[in-house]
């Protein structure tokens, strides 16, 4: 049979953390074989990583292996014993190289056996899982054990006195092999909870004892527990502080996790002893057995505990490959039978919370940006300009503060309306709009319901989808060289849209700005240099006093009264608008004659006649001026009228004009409908007045009959003149055509037209005579009249009368 395969396991630190979390939540997983296998596989992977790192550093992989003994259950009490044995190579073995200090992994410890006894046994009703998951509250006992010098180490042996055992404790290093074996018994949670926290736990280190002697020592130690508790209660020195009790409860969970890991390794190693083990560190990492280093103990030092100067941290990638790195700053301690020694530990042990595995929470940070190396002269120049500008602004601010007149702050009513009437009106209008919209929506719904009942729901009709034009029109074939032409077009478009890089533009603008700032003072601004005539400065005090007096003496400002005005009817001409812009020629110089003294002349004395003449001349001149001004005024008035009329004619949108136009259109439409009805009535009357088809046929048949008779008579009458006959035929043809046109207007029979009834007449022409024929013609007329008289309409009677008149005229001609 093939050996059972291990389950597929994700071999990374996250998987290990997940297993430990699951174990804390559900301690019953220790009974699951698959869970134990997964945990051991992860430990093996971490040990392989440790050996890989040792190989990279040049050190050979050590054949050390830490095993855990099985859990022994006594009849009287539940005891959890864990013995760790570390087998090392002999120190005397020669080595070709000298190991560095931080990689010296050779044993430096002696054989120590420390059985730790806890409180009395728990009741038998408790399950094994509760005992296994019990909290080990022994930190207080260890601190009291190693801090109080009055405590003595009780050693028991099969050959020696217990008093001499402690003295010979450190002298066995040369003879016995290096072993560290720790046995401890754990009580349940219920027993510990009821126990006094001040009670101490005795630890008796000893050598290996036979089985029967070890049972005796257990009984002796069980008897010593009450005395120890009483002594600790009486002696105040054994009382521990509340801080130490809080520290022990805080470390209980980590000790529980380590104890569970040890038990799990014990169960799995019984089935697979070839798998190497590793030690769970308090910081959350796993320390393999090949990476532990035991430190030699001396008489002045505390009992043994192992440290790891280099902990291998391992990170697995998604493809299964792993990367390892050393963390040389962390110094953890190996848990030997859950005996955690708090004395003389490193400073990093106090900061273990930093290295415990936690959920990664991203924290914001800023990248370190290198400052740009700028021009020192430009920086100095710009800083000088900035300081100068700040100084000028401060001076201007001080001068503004020292002024006598200051502007009052803008009132709130400039931006916020103080009168609530406008806001109330707006609110009322908004509410009216809302109410009107609701009412309109209600009526729209009702109208839609009525319409849908009468016309059907048009919204339910699905519109047709998009039909491409290629369905009806064949697509245009691809032109030759279409791809090359599109490529060239795209290239031209990209060249047109291309711009220079952002840095070049900013650099150009910055360089122009710095050049202007640096050399702007050197250039002479002609616009700024304006030569003014020197004037004496005004007396500002007098001006201010005058302004204040005027301000005091002024009355309250009167309210604004609106004055009616008219807009400019016509815009200014281009010449008047641009008079200031255009250059004008200089006017010729003329001396003013106003201020010159008037020369005294000998004038003729005015008479009454001259005065009348002058008045008449002045009246004529004024009349001409008034006429001229009147002409100009009338011209502009007429021009404005024409402009207004053309403007209104171009865009007439008044209601009266619209009503007038609609009235005209309605009248025109009525007239056209009346005209159409009249034309239709005339056409109908014409159709009714026209002859029927049977009447036409009978008339044509009679005409053919008469024509044949006439030809027969002409043949019989040879003696008569031919010319007279020809003239008569011409007259008959003219009369026939006129009668055909007047009768039907559209139906014309050719000369060679013959019908079946004409052949019957030919067969009967020998026996027929003129009076009978005339009688037959009258009978046909009577039949036609009788058929038409059956119809009640008068129009048909008139048409029958006209047809009868035509038949009589044709018979008279015959």
UniProtKB/Swiss-Prot annotation:
Residues 174-193, 766-779, 795-814 have a biased composition (Low complexity). Expressed in amphid and phasmid ciliated neurons. Residues 236-249 have a biased composition (Basic residues). Its main location: other. Keywords: Cell projection, Cilium, Coiled coil, Cytoplasm, Cytoskeleton. GO terms for biological process: cilium organization. One of its GO terms (cellular component) is ciliary base. The keyword Protease does not apply. It is found in: Cell projection, Cilium; Cytoplasm, Cytoskeleton, Cilium axoneme. Residues 71-130, 150-255, 569-610, 714-814 are annotated as: Disordered. Residues 99-111, 714-727, 751-765 have a biased composition (Basic and acidic residues). Belongs to the FAM161 family. This is Protein fam-161. The gene is famh-161.
């Amino acid at each position: 049979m093939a050996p059972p395969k291990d389950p597929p396991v994700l071999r990374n630190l996250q998987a290990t953390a997940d297993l430990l979390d699951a174990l804390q939540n559900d301690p019953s997983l220790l009974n699951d074989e698959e869970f134990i296998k997964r945990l051991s596989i992860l430990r093996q992977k971490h040990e392989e990583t440790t050996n890989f790192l040792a190989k990279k550093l040049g050190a050979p992989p050590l054949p050390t292996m830490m095993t855990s003994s099985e859990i022994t259950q006594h009849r009287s009490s539940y005891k959890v014993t864990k013995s760790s044995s570390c087998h090392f190579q002999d120190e005397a073995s020669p080595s070709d190289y000298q190991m560095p200090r931080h990689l010296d992994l050779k044993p430096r410890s002696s054989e120590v056996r420390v059985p730790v006894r806890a409180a009395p046994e728990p009741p038998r009703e408790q399950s094994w899982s509760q005992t296994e998951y019990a909290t080990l509250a022994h930190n207080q006992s260890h601190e009291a054990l190693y801090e109080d010098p009055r405590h003595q180490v009780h050693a028991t042996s099969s050959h020696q006195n217990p008093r001499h055992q402690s003295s010979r404790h450190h002298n066995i290093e040369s003879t016995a092999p290096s072993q560290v074996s720790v046995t401890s018994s754990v009580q349940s949670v219920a027993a510990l909870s009821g126990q006094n926290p001040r009670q101490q736990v005795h630890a008796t280190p000893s050598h290996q004892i036979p089985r029967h002697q070890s049972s005796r020592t257990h009984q002796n130690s069980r008897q010593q527990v009450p005395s120890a508790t009483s002594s600790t209660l009486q002696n105040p020195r054994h009382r521990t502080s509340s801080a130490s009790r809080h520290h022990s409860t805080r470390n209980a969970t980590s000790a529980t996790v380590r104890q569970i890991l040890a038990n799990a390794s014990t169960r799995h190693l019984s089935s697979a002893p070839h798998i190497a083990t590793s030690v769970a560190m308090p910081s959350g990492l796993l320390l393999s057995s090949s990476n532990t280093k035991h430190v030699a103990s001396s008489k002045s030092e505390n009992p043994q505990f192992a440290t790891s100067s280099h902990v291998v941290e391992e990170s697995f990638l998604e493809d299964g490959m792993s990367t390892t790195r050393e963390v040389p700053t962390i110094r953890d301690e190996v848990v030997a039978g859950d005996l955690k020694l708090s004395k003389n530990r490193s400073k990093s042990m106090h900061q273990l919370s930093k290295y415990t595995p936690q959920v990664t929470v991203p924290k914001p940070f800023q990248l370190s940006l290198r400052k740009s190396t700028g021009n020192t002269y430009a920086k100095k120049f710009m800083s000088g300009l900035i300081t100068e500008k700040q100084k000028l602004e401060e001076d201007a601010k001080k001068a503004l503060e020292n002024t006598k007149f200051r502007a009052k702050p803008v009132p709130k009513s400039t931006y916020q309306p103080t009168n609530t009437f406008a806001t109330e009106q707006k609110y009322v209008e908004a509410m009216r709009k809302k109410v009107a919209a609701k009412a309109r929506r209600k009526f729209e719904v009702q109208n839609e319901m009525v319409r849908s009942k009468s016309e059907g729901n048009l919204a339910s009709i699905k519109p047709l989808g998009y039909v491409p034009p290629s369905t009806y029109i064949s697509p245009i074939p691809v032109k030759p060289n279409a791809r090359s032409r599109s490529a060239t077009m795209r290239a031209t478009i990209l060249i047109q849209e291309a711009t220079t890089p952002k840095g070049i533009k900013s650099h150009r603008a910055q360089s122009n700005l710095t050049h202007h700032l640096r050399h702007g003072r050197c250039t002479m601004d002609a616009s700024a240099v304006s030569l003014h005539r020197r004037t004496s400065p005004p007396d500002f005090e007098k001006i201010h006093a005058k302004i204040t007096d005027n301000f005091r003496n002024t009355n309250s400002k009167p309210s604004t009264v609106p004055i009616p005005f008219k807009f400019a009817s016509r815009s200014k001409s281009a010449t008047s608008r641009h008079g200031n812009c255009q250059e004008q020629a200089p006017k010729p110089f003329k001396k003013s004659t106003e201020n010159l003294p008037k020369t005294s002349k000998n004038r003729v004395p005015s008479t009454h006649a001259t005065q009348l003449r002058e008045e008449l001349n002045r009246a004529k001149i004024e009349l001409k001026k008034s006429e001229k001004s009147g002409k100009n005024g009338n011209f502009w008035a007429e021009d404005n009228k024409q402009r207004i009329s053309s403007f209104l004619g171009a865009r007439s949108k008044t209601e009266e004009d619209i009503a007038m136009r609609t009235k005209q259109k309605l009248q025109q439409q009525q007239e056209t409908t009346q005209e159409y009805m009249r034309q239709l009535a005339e056409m109908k009357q014409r159709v009714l007045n026209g002859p029927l088809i049977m009447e036409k046929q009978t008339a044509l048949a009679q005409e053919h009959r008469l024509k044949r008779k006439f030809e027969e008579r002409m043949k019989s009458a040879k003696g008569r003149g031919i010319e007279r006959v020809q003239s008569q035929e011409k007259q008959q043809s003219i009369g026939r055509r006129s009668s055909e046109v007047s009768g039907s207007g559209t139906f014309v029979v050719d000369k060679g037209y013959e019908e079946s009834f004409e052949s019957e007449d030919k067969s009967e022409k020998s026996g027929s005579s003129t009076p009978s024929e005339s009688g037959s013609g009258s009978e046909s007329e009577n039949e036609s009249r009788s058929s038409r008289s059956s119809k009640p309409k008068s129009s048909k009677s008139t048409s029958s009368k006209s047809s009868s008149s035509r038949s009589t005229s044709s018979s008279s001609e015959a």
